[in-house]
């Protein structure tokens, strides 16, 4: 589930502390360590400078990688330092990895009351089709839910006031109820006014929260599953 899509900034300056002598790592070819067409990065750094000067806009950064990204090792350090310096726009893209039976970062938790079928971009099982996180989950049990709880850390508050759910949407998909521990925030009708495919549904909340529950709900005999990608 997308919990307030992450936005953060960084602005770097070269100093003596950033420089490592070539003698320390003689096997590195520093001449080959060159950015091609660095001028294309200037708009990016201009936005970072605006954030540093107090601008309230958001800058989204997509960090692509392998299982080390999934476990949030490097990406957590980068995200934390960016947000501590330039402002915290939220935890960003999360997926219920624990529910899917794999490793999960330590700054949020996922749980469910049912078992989910998992489709991963690695391996031979790609049913359901993997989504933006490289993985998707599906349940055929009405009433099955996924809980997401964000955890504050390093003086960063990861409460959120909106959710963007990436999901399959057609006449065969369950409807979904989106709630916190007390309030009903939204209701997703999977077959309403849409062609078949993958969709993003945005749900605003009435107040910040660290918890959301997405619950599948069968409302017609034709519905047989719920499929989530992010």
Identify the role of each PLM range.
Residues 1, 9-64, 68-230:
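N-terminal secretory targeting modules
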């Amino acid at each position: 589930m997308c919990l307030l899509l992450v936005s953060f900034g960084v602005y770097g300056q070269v100093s003596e502390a950033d420089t490592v002598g070539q003698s320390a790592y003689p096997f590195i070819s520093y001449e080959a360590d060159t950015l091609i067409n660095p001028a294309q990065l200037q708009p990016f750094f201009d936005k970072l400078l605006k954030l540093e000067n107090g601008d309230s806009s958001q800058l989204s950064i997509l960090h692509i990688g392998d299982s080390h990204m999934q476990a949030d090792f490097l990406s957590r350090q980068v995200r934390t330092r960016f947000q501590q310096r330039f402002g915290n726009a939220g935890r960003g893209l999360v997926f219920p990895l624990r529910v899917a039976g794999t490793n999960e970062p330590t700054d949020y938790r996922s749980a469910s009351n049912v078992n989910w079928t998992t489709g991963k971009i690695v391996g031979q099982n790609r049913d359901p089709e993997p989504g933006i996180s490289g993985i998707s989950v599906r349940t055929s049990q009405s009433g099955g839910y996924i809980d997401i709880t964000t955890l504050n850390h390093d003086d960063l508050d990861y409460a959120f006031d909106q959710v963007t759910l990436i999901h399959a949407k057609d006449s065969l998909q369950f409807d979904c109820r989106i709630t916190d521990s007390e309030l009903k925030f939204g209701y997703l009708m999977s077959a309403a006014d849409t062609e078949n495919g993958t969709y993003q549904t945005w749900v605003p909340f009435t107040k910040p929260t660290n918890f959301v529950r997405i619950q599948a709900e069968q409302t017609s005999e034709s519905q047989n599953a719920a499929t989530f990608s992010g």
